[in-house]
């Protein structure tokens, strides 16, 4: 069995991109992908005249296959009756009304990076494709930056930075769409410094369907006196496909004052200092591996408060299976920070202390935007995948570290990985009920994945990831229940196994794992704004009762 995993896609590709800057230790890739610049403030019709009319693509249209195969996960392929390509909020209203009149179940796609088959569900008959709604501009009326859901993170970063010098603390993959990323409370390299992206969400425009079955536009803001405020709150981590269709976000940092756009969102760094640290599996004994895991966890337990010198540091530890050849620690920090190089050196030394193994270290410095846009996410055609997640409040136990070693070091052709993301910092300074993103007391975010190409290998790969996940959380029913050690999991890492009692024996329902105590409040929003349960999928917020 030959399988390509996330390490190959992010690890090797990311490493190559990292060392192509102004300070070079090894050779590397070149520049950043092209992205759409900001456009002037515009009404719904667009900044440069009327936008394209609503496009309706059926199964015989030559564009159909391109539109229905945009999903990230090749395990799922939908066959809807129609795909609506929309360009304005009014067109979204029109498309929803047409689908409702035809009795078609609706799903929405922006970037297409959902890990499960929520859009490519066989029951979905109408897909509303948001990819052409991609404007980014400053809205002086709201003193906030408007971003449409079809814009990618890369396009958004480029526009915000080149025109105003600001950014949002969103994800590392520039191809990901803004639409679902923000809805799930997305995070990224600046989250320890600035919080999750939803912490900077001021307002949202949503197309909802009322009890009569008619669609309409609603704007909801964070203002305390806004009668629609709960709808805004639900979009700060409630996840996609629950309440309606987002047609526009507005971003402004809470407490930001004045009318100067350059002061209304976090300033982007001017440069990024990056270290890529690799350990060869051939040199790793179980003792060395578990010591690295222990050191990594202990460091985060001591360095995850807000406002420390490490606030702008982001690291991803790619614990790859032996088939990949290496494990890799990818670290970056604000290159303009005094002592940045020493901070990263100290972090690497702390993680490697007492292992007896000397890792390879590649160092680079490059302009922030170039570094940010260079993290291209490429599956290389290996697009069948399964993902799982967790939040850690404390480091792995000795038993969990041993479980990681046993599964990852096995002589297997399954190329899986367990990725450990630095977390905490500013994220943890926000009360868990202030937004729908409830996990506000964690030090590490975990993403587990297996990725492969051949459908014949589905069973082996699914078994691998399910078994490692269940064993790691064996003492809590096979899942990371909210307790003193773990804090549930991340809705943008959707995992339908959490609904299945074969894999979740904890007695804790899936919605508590994702939303903790915020779920009943989300249900109330659902009841008000989607009373007919038009927007639903396998892990959607259920109507109350």
From Swiss-Prot:
Biological processes annotated in GO: antibiotic biosynthetic process
Active-site residues per Swiss-Prot or TrEMBL entry: 421, 493
E.C. number: 1.1.3.45, 1.3.3.14
Binding-site positions, aclacinomycin Y: 451, 493
Effect of mutating residue 187 to F: Loss of oxidase activity. Loss of oxidase activity
Entry cofactors: FAD
Activity-pH behavior: Optimum pH is 5.5.
Molecular-function annotations in GO: FAD binding; oxidoreductase activity
Other comments on record: AknOx uses two distinct sets of catalytic residues in the two reactions. Tyr-421 is responsible for the proton abstraction from C3 of cinerulose A in the second reaction, for formation L-aculose.
Role this protein plays: Involved in the modification of the terminal sugar residues in the last two steps in the biosynthesis of polyketide antibiotics of the aclacinomycin group. In the first reaction, it catalyzes the oxidation of the hydroxyl group at carbon C4 of the L-rhodinose terminal sugar moiety of aclacinomycin N (AclN) to a keto group, modifying the sugar to cinerulose A and generating aclacinomycin A (AclA).
Subunit structure: Homotetramer; dimer of dimers.
Family: Belongs to the oxygen-dependent FAD-linked oxidoreductase family.
Protein name as it appears in the record: Aclacinomycin-N/aclacinomycin-A oxidase
Organism: Streptomyces galilaeus
Chain's gene name: aknOx
């Amino acid at each position: 069995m030959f399988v390509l995993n996330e390490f190959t896609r992010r690890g090797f590709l990311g490493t190559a991109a990292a060392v192509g800057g102004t300070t070079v230790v090894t050779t590397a890739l070149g520049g950043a992908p092209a992205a759409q610049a900001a456009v002037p403030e515009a009404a719904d019709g667009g900044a440069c005249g009327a936008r394209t009319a609503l496009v309706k693509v059926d199964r015989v249209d030559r564009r159909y296959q391109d539109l229905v195969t945009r999903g990230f996960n090749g395990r799922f392929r939908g066959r809807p009756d129609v795909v609506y390509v929309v360009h304005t909020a009014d067109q979204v209203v029109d498309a929803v009304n047409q689908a409702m009149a035809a009795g078609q179940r609706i799903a929405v796609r922006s970037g297409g990076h959902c890990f499960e088959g929520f859009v490519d569900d066989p029951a979905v008959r109408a897909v509303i494709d948001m990819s052409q709604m991609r404007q980014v501009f400053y809205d002086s009326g709201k003193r906030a930056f408007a971003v449409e859901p079809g814009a990618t993170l890369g396009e958004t970063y480029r526009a915000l930075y080149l025109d105003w010098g600001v950014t949002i603390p969103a994800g590392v993959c520039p191809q990901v769409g803004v639409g679902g990323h923000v809805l799930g409370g997305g995070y990224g390299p600046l989250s320890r410094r600035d919080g999750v992206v939803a912490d900077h969400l001021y307002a949202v425009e949503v197309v909802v369907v009322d009890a009569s079955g008619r669609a309409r536009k609603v704007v909801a803001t964070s203002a305390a006196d806004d009668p629609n405020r709960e709808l805004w709150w639900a979009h700060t981590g409630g996840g996609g496909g629950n309440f309606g269709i987002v047609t526009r976000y507005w971003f402004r940092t809470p407490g930001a004052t004045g009318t100067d756009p350059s002061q209304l969102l976090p300033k982007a760094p001017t440069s990024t200092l990056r270290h890529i640290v690799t350990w060869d599996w051939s040199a790793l004994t179980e003792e060395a591996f578990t010591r690295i895991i222990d050191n990594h966890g202990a460091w985060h337990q001591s360095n995850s408060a807000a406002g420390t010198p490490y606030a702008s540091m982001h690291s991803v530890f790619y614990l790859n299976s032996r088939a990949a050849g290496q494990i890799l620690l990818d670290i970056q920090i604000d290159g303009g920070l005094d002592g940045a190089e020493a901070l990263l050196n100290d972090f690497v030394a702390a993680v490697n202390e007492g292992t007896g193994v000397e890792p390879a270290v590649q160092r680079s410095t490059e302009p922030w935007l170039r570094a940010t846009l260079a993290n291209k996410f490429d599956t290389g055609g290996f697009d069948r995948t399964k993902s799982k997640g967790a939040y850690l409040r404390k480091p792995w136990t000795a038993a969990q570290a041993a479980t990681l070693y046993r599964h990852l070091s096995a002589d297997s052709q399954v190329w899986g990985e367990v990725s450990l993301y630095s977390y905490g910092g500013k994220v943890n300074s926000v009360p868990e009920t202030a937004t729908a993103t409830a996990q506000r007391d964690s030090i590490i975010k975990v993403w587990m994945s297996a990725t492969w190409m051949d459908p014949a290998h589905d069973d082996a790969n699914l078994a691998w990831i399910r078994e490692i996940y269940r064993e790691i959380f064996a003492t809590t029913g096979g899942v990371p229940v909210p307790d003193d050690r773990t804090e549930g999991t991340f809705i943008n890492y959707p995992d339908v196994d959490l609904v299945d009692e074969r894999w979740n024996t904890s007695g804790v329902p899936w919605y508590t794992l994702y939303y903790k105590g915020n779920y009943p409040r989300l249900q109330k929003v659902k009841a008000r704004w989607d009373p007919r349960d038009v927007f639903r999928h396998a892990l959607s917020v259920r109507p109350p009762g």
